[in-house]
Amino acid sequence: MPASTPVLFVIDGDPGAAHALRDDLSRRFGREFRIVCESAADAGLAALRELAVRRVPVALLVVGQDLNGMSGVAFLGHAHKMHPQAVRTTSCCID
């Protein structure tokens, strides 16, 4: 995929949930988008910073509610500053 391929970004404090969503998105949208998955807030913000520096568009941010030290809403606030054009949503898992 070209470096400018838009990104669907997934982050969840539960690595299993993050990877399951990543796999689902990859099956459905993997030909048109690059799927990036993280499970920690600091790693997620670092990945988003790198994408911003490289001017890679982020089309969608799917963010879990609890990122082990940061809320999903707080993460979205930081992410919005780097990628204001991205569609932003939160996710939750119900057992």
Predicted regions span which residues?
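Conserved Asp/Asn-Gly motif in the active-site loop of CheY-like receiver
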Residues: 35-42
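Short amphipathic alpha-helix used as the core "switch/output" element in two-component signaling
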Residues: 46-49, 66, 72-87
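Short acidic, S/G/P-rich loop/turn micro-motifs used as interaction or catalytic elements
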Residues: 14-16, 66-70, 95
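Active-site residues of response regulator receiver
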Residues: 59-65
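Hydrophobic/aromatic residues positioned on beta-strands within the core alpha/beta folds
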Residues: 63, 88-93
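Non-catalytic signal-transmission and effector/linker regions of two-component phosphorelay proteins
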Residues: 1-34, 49-57, 81
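Cofactor-binding loop segments of dinucleotide-utilizing enzymes, especially the Rossmann-like FAD-
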Residues: 13, 40, 93
